[in-house]
Amino acid sequence: MALSRWLEQARAMLGAPGLRAIDVDASRWRDVAQDVAAAGGRLLALWGGRTRDTDRKVVMLVLLPDGALVVTLALDRALERVPGIEDVFPSATRMQRALYDLTGIRTTDPDTRPWLRHAAWPAEAFPLTTRELPTPPSRPIDDYAFVRVEGDGVHEIPVGPVHAGIIEPGHFRFSIVGEKVLRLEQRLGYVHKGIERRFTELPILAGHRLAARVSGDSAVAFAWAYCQALEGMSAVRVPPRAAWLRALALELERCANHLGDLGALGNDAGFAFGLSQFMRLKEGWLRATERALDQRYLLDFVVPGGTSADLQADGASTLSQAVRTLEPEVRKLREIYEEHAGVRDRFLATGTVAPELAARLGLVGLAGRASAQAFDLRVDLPCEPYASLEVTKCVHDAGDVLARVTVRFDELLASLRLVETILRGLPPGDHAAVVHAPAEGSSGIGLVEGWRGPVAVALEAGPDGGIRRCHPHDPSWNNWPVLEHAVIGNIVPDFPLINKSFNLSYSGQDL
């Protein structure tokens, strides 16, 4: 059945623009996935929950060339396992494993190893299905069955979960011959915090604060996606000024992260000068953000109905001056990076993900655009005010560290121009509207292009102004598996550089 047949049956869904939804039974679950893949679509997120106290469901959110589709499978009590889609969308494997860890819903995926459960609860307990928190088991931590690579001269290097430096934990198991990487297998989930369960304990009008803390470097993106879903469910139209202020905050966040990454990438290539210069620029950018909007990282700037504060004339002047100061310095540092033979040698042809592989694995966001995956929600599924702005889609086709650095430079400069455009075109009016709790059972999904890639928040209203279910999705879910492929054939000392060129979130993945 062609994708068009499914779309003809689909209904509009609340939240992000371009969203459609369809309900299917188990016999058609894989058919939809296969038709989406054949049409050039890709899986963004997969999660499970309850439609009522006893009924269970599984949901997948797929991105299409001209929209997004939410596919819901209500589970028949007689259905023992949901048909797996890991052969259609390889990124589904970890999502399906997490689905079982949290809800007890098993798929036919042959990989049944735990993903988020690190012996914090018994194997037979599922945190999203009971009111009481499961008791931690008294038995030792489960052994995790890494895939073994055997052969002459092959040995393993375990790295982590505790790393040097101030970063979150993750385990990397390298199988190597000499210094050459034959295989990398990741073990994540060490910072699982029970975020999805915590959402169900909060009022729906306060959930945006937790959403902003799913992955702290993407606070604006997650808070906006949450509020976008909530506002759609509540039939609230955000004032134009509020929408423009949100876009301003999102681009400020994008610039700050790109500045930090470009410095760190220089450092990982042995160019400490790059780190010191970009950290200086990032600090100046954060200080300007704080002077203009009273927060460095804008954790609580986006609120239901708009923003928590307005931008005053002196704040706009501060940001405009920051752009004029920053842009020429970024251009000069770009020249230095491009002309430095040692840096270029480390970046070029390192950690390559060919466009064909990127498409097959579902690489998204900045890393995807560096491998010719030309999708950007700000252009392809724009919410206001992006539909009114001329957003440059920055794409490269080499797929190596150099390409990911190039896309960062391009996006940084493009975002600086966007900030100036927003400051000049900021409409008058209110910066927030009143939002009331939506009716029980209503649902919506927010979609926002964060600096790392597409951020999604699926929200369902519960009784008495509460939350029945909330699933926040970080693009790191899609991109962590691709990193395992990017390092194959490279040498072990290049892994920190390759890893940083993706700069994926542990917290956003681990929930």
Question: What spans do the regions from the language model cover?
Answer:
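Short, glycine/acidic-rich hinge or "gate" loops at secondary-structure transitions
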Residues: 109-117, 267-274, 299-303
